[in-house]
Amino acid sequence: MNIHEYQGKDILRKFGVTVPKGIVAYSADEAKQAAEQLFAETGSSVVVVKAQIHAGGRGKAGGVKLAKSPEEAFEIARQMIGMTLITHQTGPEGKVVSRLLIEEGMGIEKEFYVGITLDRATSRNVLMVSTEGGMEIETVAEETPEKLLKIQIDPLFGMQGFQAREAAFFLGLEGEQFRNAVNFITALYKAYTSIDASVAEINPLVVTSEGKVIALDAKINFDDNALYRHKEYMELRDTSEEDPFEVEASKSNLNYVRLDGNVGCMVNGAGLAMGTMDIIQLAGGKPANFLDVGGTASPQTVEEGFKIILSDKNVRAILVNIFGGIVRCDRVAGGIMEAAKKMDLHLPVIVRLEGTNASIAQQMLDESGLSLIAAKGLRDAAQKVQEALA
């Protein structure tokens, strides 16, 4: 689960991570009031008006601007709220700005990058720091890897003090700035582990002219599988920032990702789903979605899966690819038949069922009287999809 910058900063503040003073605003009037309050409380000469969307690259797209007065903050907010912000992470459709973060300005002396995430190759959390603050960390890793330090964290011991100090040394900090950076990194790691985050990224981390180490921006992503342990954070979810198809799928515990093709896919198991999309592509088609109905697919989940696939008007054919291990193919076949009858399917539906009770399932489909196309293997299924689209 992704959350907004201001929400992430509110969480980090509770763990002792230093963040600027800021106030969220939902209108130009609220932005003006927030600016007046920040000017009065901080003595800053400027405030920063920041669009709140679930995407990076906001500054280059005009989503981060400075205001030297409450009136200027009002005018910027008036133009920004309701605008569609297009960045390299939003795609060409962009995201509509519905809220802003009004934040105190900072006298920036240095900019760095600090992030913590899970390294799946080593099954360990990794602390990453870079002297290239404000840059995409993927670009830094590819073009100037010598400017990026990765520190593997032993899950048995957690991050140790010497590792936080190693990171601060790498950034070239000394004296009070060094001590502040060590404390910052330690607090960030505590927050990351305590809330079961999948990503805690500060970009940029800045050192101010007063020597303070502050998170100028913050990205916090939660591990969905651990959210049941943090129900207080579930209310932070902003479904308006998510694809409506994916939101609907999550209500039925379906793992769905919308793509831009025309072949709807319904598969059980993430690995098989990715393999299915690959072979559709190899056969000349384009998958319209990733849809994993899970290892215990039932007639109900199959029916819900069809509803979600068919809600995408770009879909011109559907491929159902089920391997029956725990799940019984005859139960899935029952779900396919029920869905086909209820929804009056007019699109070609190619079905490949293998595994437990596959022969029974095949017989059920053959005798159903429905125009379902049976496939004998994955390659045959992909070929039949292409024939149906021709």
From Swiss-Prot:
SUPFAM superfamilies in the cross-refs: Glutathione synthetase ATP-binding domain-like (SSF56059), Succinyl-CoA synthetase domains (SSF52210)
GO cellular component: cytosol; succinate-CoA ligase complex
Gene3D superfamilies linked: ATP-grasp fold, A domain (3.30.1490.20), ATP-grasp fold, B domain (3.30.470.20), Succinyl-CoA synthetase domains (3.40.50.261)
Keyword Nucleotide-binding: yes
Residues annotated as binding Mg(2+): N203, D217
Cofactor(s) annotated in UniProt: Mg(2+)
EC number per UniProt: 6.2.1.5
Any one GO biological process: tricarboxylic acid cycle
UniProt xrefs under InterPro entries: ATP-grasp (IPR011761), ATP-grasp_succ-CoA_synth-type (IPR013650), ATP_grasp_subdomain_1 (IPR013815), Succ-CoA_synthase_bsu_CS (IPR017866), SUCC_ACL_C (IPR005811), Succ_CoA_ligase-like_bsu (IPR005809), Succinyl-CoA_synth-like (IPR016102)
Positions bound to ATP: K50, G57, R58, G59, E103, M106, E111
Protein's pathway: Carbohydrate metabolism; tricarboxylic acid cycle; succinate from succinyl-CoA (ligase route): step 1/1
Keywords of the record: ATP-binding, Ligase, Magnesium, Metal-binding, Nucleotide-binding, Tricarboxylic acid cycle
Cofactor info, note text: Binds 1 Mg(2+) ion per subunit.
Catalytic activity: succinate + ATP + CoA = succinyl-CoA + ADP + phosphate; GTP + succinate + CoA = succinyl-CoA + GDP + phosphate
GO function terms (MF aspect): ATP binding; magnesium ion binding; succinate-CoA ligase (ADP-forming) activity; succinate-CoA ligase (GDP-forming) activity
Domain ATP-grasp: 9-248
Residue positions binding substrate: N268, G325, I326, V327
Pfam families cross-referenced by the UniProt entry: ATP-grasp_2 (PF08442), Ligase_CoA (PF00549)
PANTHER family: SUCCINATE--COA LIGASE [GDP-FORMING] SUBUNIT BETA, MITOCHONDRIAL, SUCCINYL-COA SYNTHETASE BETA CHAIN
Family: Belongs to the succinate/malate CoA ligase beta subunit family.
Protein function: Succinyl-CoA synthetase functions in the citric acid cycle (TCA), coupling the hydrolysis of succinyl-CoA to the synthesis of either ATP or GTP and thus represents the only step of substrate-level phosphorylation in the TCA. The beta subunit provides nucleotide specificity of the enzyme and binds the substrate succinate, while the binding sites for coenzyme A and phosphate are found in the alpha subunit.
Subunit and partners: Heterotetramer of two alpha and two beta subunits.
Protein name: Succinate--CoA ligase [ADP-forming] subunit beta
Organism: Chlorobium chlorochromatii (strain CaD3)
Lineage: Bacteria, Pseudomonadati, Chlorobiota, Chlorobiia, Chlorobiales
